[in-house]
Each structure stands twice: as C-alpha cells, then as structure tokens.
C-alpha cells in the first residue's frame, strides 16, 4: 500500500483501539501493545514495544496516569490524529524513509523541525518536507499571535505541529480558534518551574476545549531540583496531561545528567502523578536510535533564537 492508504488504515486502527480501551479498560491496551510487539519487524520498533510492555506492568505508573487523562479529557479525533501524524508519520514511516535517504546520501536529516510561527515560507516548506517523510514541526509563537498556526495546520492535515506559546497569549478567544486544528499540540511555555496563574488559566482553557496540550518548563542549575519534588509533581498533575522539561542555555552538564537520570528513572516508579518528558534527552535519544545522521531540524531565519535548545 502507498503512504496514504497505510495512514488511513492506521487511523482506523487508532480509533478502534481508543474505543476498545475505553470499553475494555487497560487490559485492552496491554493486548494492543502485545500485538504490536509481536508484529514489529525493525529493532527500533521492537525496543519501543518491549519498553511499553514493561511500563504497563504496573497500573500505578505515570504512563497510566497519562492515558487516563488523555481518554478523559482529550477529544478522540485529536488523540488519533496527533498519534498517527507524530507516531506513524513521524517516527515509523517518516523516520524509515529519512533513514534510507541519509544512508544513501550521507547528509543530515530531521524528523522534527523548528520554525517561527507565522513564517510565510512554511506554506511551501511543510508540504515539501512531508514529501520527503518529515511530518513533525515545533513552532515558536512566544512573541507572536499563536492563532497564526491555524491556516498552516489545516492546510497540512497529515503533519503534526507543536506550538510554543506564552500562556498570557492563550486567551479564551485564541484557544477557541486553535481548537479548530486536530493536528496541534499546544505547549504553554513557563520560564521557571513555578506554576503561574497565567499558566493555570491557559491549561484550563485548553482542557475545556478537549485539546492536546503539554505544559513546557524551562529549567537551569538553580531550579532543576524542583521538578522532581513530589509537591511540584502533584501541582503539575492537576493542570496538564504531561510536562515537558527543557534546559536553558548555560545549564551545566552535571545538572543535565542528573535531571535526565531522574526523569527516566521516575517513569517506571510507582505513584508518580504525572509523566515528565525531557526535550533535550528524549529527542536526542530518538535521533540516535533512528540514524547517525539524524539531527534537530531548523528553518529559523538567520540570526533568530529559539526558546528550546536545538542540539
């Protein structure tokens, strides 16, 4: 089958899986993971589903907390669209196609690309990238109107877009406008681990629209220790599906190693109320697993900076 046919089949399967899990509980989820582990052919896929089997052995893990929140608070079409576009399009089909190109040409490739929200070039760059197998974008809207993403996202329904935004810009009207996009993950950006009133309001507006969102927190040497404290995790669990941690420039290597170790170990511990993602470590891990040529993509204008590190 061609990509469109395979994607359509995958989308149908995703909707069926969500329905089965809602009706049959997490036993059905484990059944699906076991089936995928059996069918997986490539080592990267086998490793992923083996980890998923391990993670789902305990029903009090943060993975179950995430799945509960997704099923309870996010529209099914959003779950399936983001999952298929990012998971199948980005990390299975797309990554495989990109790896073939890289192995042949020996040139850097990227499954995820950073850009400035509102950049007029994206109307051509996004579909062109999809034609090569790159479907995932991370857009910076921290100093512009986040609603500018809507036309781009609607015009490229097979791509997935992460949208970094200042919580104060995510007004009720803005969030209602963003809700028209099924292939969007909104990422309110907090400059410190402090859960600000603006951050809480933004999260609750997104939740009210049954949207896919992830509070994203910048940390440094002084604040890294806060993100593994139980009271901080509990407060984040009240407001977000999961939490993305990203290191500010200048954060020491020692702090980075400790944070990475704490986040990874915490994912399999019992009783953790919220899943923590590690922007720097997780994307780098995925890149290394896919190909030695995989890197962070960027089409930022010359001289521009980005809120998250790209390397």
Where are these regions (language model features)?
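Accessory C-terminal segments flanking Radical SAM cores
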Residues: 1-46, 50-53, 259-311
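N-terminal [4Fe-4S]-dependent radical SAM core
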Residues: 42-115
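Core AdoMet radical
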Residues: 110-120, 129-145, 156-171, 177-197, ...
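Conserved C-terminal portion of the radical SAM core fold
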Residues: 117, 136, 183, 197-288, ...
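Generic structural signal for hydrophobic
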Residues: 125-129, 152-153, 177-178, 203-206, ...
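Short low-complexity, flexible loop/linker segments enriched in glycine and/or proline
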Residues: 147-158, 178, 203, 229-233, ...
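Alpha-helix-loop-beta-strand connector modules within alpha/beta enzyme cores
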Residues: 148-166, 263-275
């Amino acid at each position: 089958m061609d990509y469109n046919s395979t994607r359509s089949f995958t989308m149908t399967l995703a909707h069926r899986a969500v329905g089965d899990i809602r009706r049959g509980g997490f036993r059905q989820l484990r059944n699906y993971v076991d089936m995928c582990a059996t069918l997986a052919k490539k080592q990267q896929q086998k490793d992923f589903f083996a980890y998923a089997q391990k993670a789902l052995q305990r029903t009090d893990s943060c993975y179950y907390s995430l799945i509960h929140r997704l099923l309870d608070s996010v529209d099914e079409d959003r779950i399936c669209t983001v999952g298929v576009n990012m998971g199948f399009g980005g990390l299975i089909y797309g990554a495989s196609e990109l790896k073939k190109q890289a192995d042949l040409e020996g040139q850097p490739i990227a499954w995820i690309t950073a850009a400035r929200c509102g950049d007029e070039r994206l109307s051509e760059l996004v579909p062109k990238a999809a034609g090569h197998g790159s479907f995932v974008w991370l857009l910076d809207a921290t100093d512009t109107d986040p609603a500018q993403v809507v036309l781009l996202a609607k015009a490229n329904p097979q791509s997935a877009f992460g949208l970094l935004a200042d919580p104060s810009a995510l007004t009720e009207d803005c969030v209602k406008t963003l809700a028209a996009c099924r292939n969007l993950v909104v990422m309110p950006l907090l400059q410190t681990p402090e859960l600000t009133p603006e951050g809480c309001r933004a999260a609750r507006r997104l939740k009210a629209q049954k949207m896919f969102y992830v509070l994203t927190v910048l940390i440094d040497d002084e604040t890294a220790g806060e993100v593994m404290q139980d009271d901080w995790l509990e407060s984040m669990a009240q407001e977000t599906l999961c939490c993305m941690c990203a290191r500010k420039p200048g954060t020491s290597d020692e702090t980075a190693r400790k944070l990475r170790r704490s986040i990874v170990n915490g994912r399999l511990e019992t009783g953790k109320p919220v899943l923590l993602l590690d922007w720097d470590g997780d994307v780098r891990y995925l890149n290394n697993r896919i190909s030695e040529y995989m890197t962070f993509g960027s089409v930022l204008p010359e001289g521009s900076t980005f809120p998250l590190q790209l390397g």
